[in-house]
């Protein structure tokens, strides 16, 4: 473990039930699920880098689906998204012990996530923000994993060198992005086959 640890959110620190969003939101909008999902996942990346707000995202999705984006409906969709996000996210049992142990060792902690605008509220409510030195969210900084730029930005915020940092993520491609700038990447795979060098638990990284 280096002097700094960069940690992903979704799939690493917490689980989320995106399939619930994929079912409930199109029902609320009165749109066929397949039509909604095709439009949503084509447009959603713009939200992940802060180019559109969640409300603007739903306006665009509704228009693409041939539905008039009534202001009331858009508000309902945004509210439902946040409600589902907060209700269905669950910290993995090793997440807070891992972050707390890092703090006790004096290891700087950065949260690095590809996400939309409501993630900060979520991770604040779960106690993650209080344990972090730096929080880098793609929607706020306009940078996204696996681009090396988001890792360089995070290292700059932490004021540490790449060789002194470790990055933990459930996506192998994102770990490779960190390694491209000299940060050691560790993939966490909680279920299924364990690739070489990957870990099953965050606590395995502590040594």
Model-derived regions: residue spans:
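N-terminal helical cap/lid subdomain that shapes the substrate entry/recognition surface
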Residues: 1-93
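Asp-based, Mg2+/Mn2+-dependent phosphohydrolase catalytic module
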Residues: 1-7, 96, 100-101, 107, ...
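Hydrophobic alpha-helical bundle segments that form small-molecule/ligand-binding pockets
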Residues: 66, 102-103
